[in-house]
A protein has these predicted regions:
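Conserved helicase RecA-like core
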Residues: 1-329
């Protein structure tokens, strides 16, 4: 916030900010955006793009909190899986800030129910996640409709070649702000690896969970099937666990996430994609039951614990064949 806010209050100041989740970035871009809004002019002035519905709602909620003493400022979350008609109605009534997932925003653009010609500021939050989820073409189409004369801010946990390419394409003389070192995981996280035979993996997981009775954490699996199987086994064995993956309906996912947020649920077994929109500050543990494919994904997972000055533990349960991959990570 110290780095970003003063810079963003200026004009024509593009920013690439490399920051882990949990570093206060919503306020870093949100406060200057709110400051720049002309409330009397009820047209879209700022656009925030983010990868998931959950993050979209969370950012919109934060912006509403920050601006609650500014009479008449309107923030509209635009996301799939909800009524498009109510979003179209809100756009007709006039909004100042649009927080959107790329897919639903494109849909509205194609229906000619939203115009981006008055946008002065664009934020791409968790840009690396949006690219990982295959939104590159959507982002290109959206930014082609936004005026060239704009401020563009790109927030990403890691500096991948794709992020470098997209910032070169859309940002002008961007200031690069790095909170912590590039691509590093947060220093408040202790990393632990347990090597076991493949057949003993679930037994090892139970031992770990038993060793930390106060655990409040996420267990990451690689597939939806494995996620459901592990969650079912843990529940059968009496643990306070549940699953989160793409085969659940939106209503089921919302229920599970809400239970987890308010700590009615101790252990969430999840896929990477399903957990993307979940933002919880005080997780004690992240357990990699299935190793991710690359260091970036591992950094994202482990960055969910050890936030906001607290300490956390990232545990990987690997089999003998995965030792080389773990060493690379």
């Amino acid at each position: 916030q110290e780095e970003v806010i003063p810079y963003l209050l200026g004009e024509n100041n593009d920013v690439v900010a490399l920051a882990q989740t949990g570093t206060g970035k919503t306020a870093a871009f949100g406060l200057p955006l709110i400051q720049k809004i002309n409330v009397k002019n009820r047209i879209p002035q700022s656009l925030i793009l983010c990868p998931t519905r959950e993050l979209c709602l969370q950012i919109a909620g934060d912006l509403n909190d920050y601006s609650k003493y500014i009479t008449g400022l309107r923030v509209l979350p635009v996301y799939g899986g909800s009524s498009i008609d109510s979003q179209i109605r809100a756009l007709k009534q006039g909004v100042h800030i649009i927080v959107a997932t790329p897919g639903r925003l494109l849909d509205l653009m194609e229906r000619k129910t939203v115009s981006l010609t008055t946008i002065q500021n664009v934020v791409m939050d968790e840009a690396d996640e949006m690219l990982n989820m295959g939104f590159t073409d959507s982002i290109n189409a959206i930014l082609a409709d936004v005026p060239q004369e704009r401020n563009t801010l790109l927030f990403s946990a890691t500096m991948s070649p794709e992020i470098a390419r997209i910032s070169k394409k859309y940002l002008r003389d961007a200031k690069e702000i790095t909170i912590g070192r590039k691509n590093e995981s947060t220093s408040n996280v202790k990393h632990v690896v347990f090597t076991v035979h493949a057949k003993d993996k679930y037994a090892a997981l139970k031992r770990i969970v038993d060793y930390y009775p106060q655990i409040y954490g996420i267990i990451f699996c690689r597939t939806r099937k494995e996620t459901q199987e592990i969650a079912d086994k843990l529940m059968q064995d009496g643990y306070n666990a549940d699953s989160l993956h793409g085969e659940l309906s939106q209503a089921q996912r919302d229920t599970v996430m809400q239970k987890f947020r308010i700590r009615n649920l101790q252990i969430l077994v999840a896929t990477d994609v399903a957990a993307r929109g979940l933002d919880v500050d005080d997780l004690t543990h992240v357990i990699n039951y299935g190793l991710p494919d690359d260091t970036e994904s591992y950094t994202h997972r482990s960055g969910r614990t050890g936030r906001a000055g607290k300490t956390g533990t990232s545990i990987a349960i690997i089999n003998l064949r995965e030792k080389g991959k773990m060493r690379e990570i």
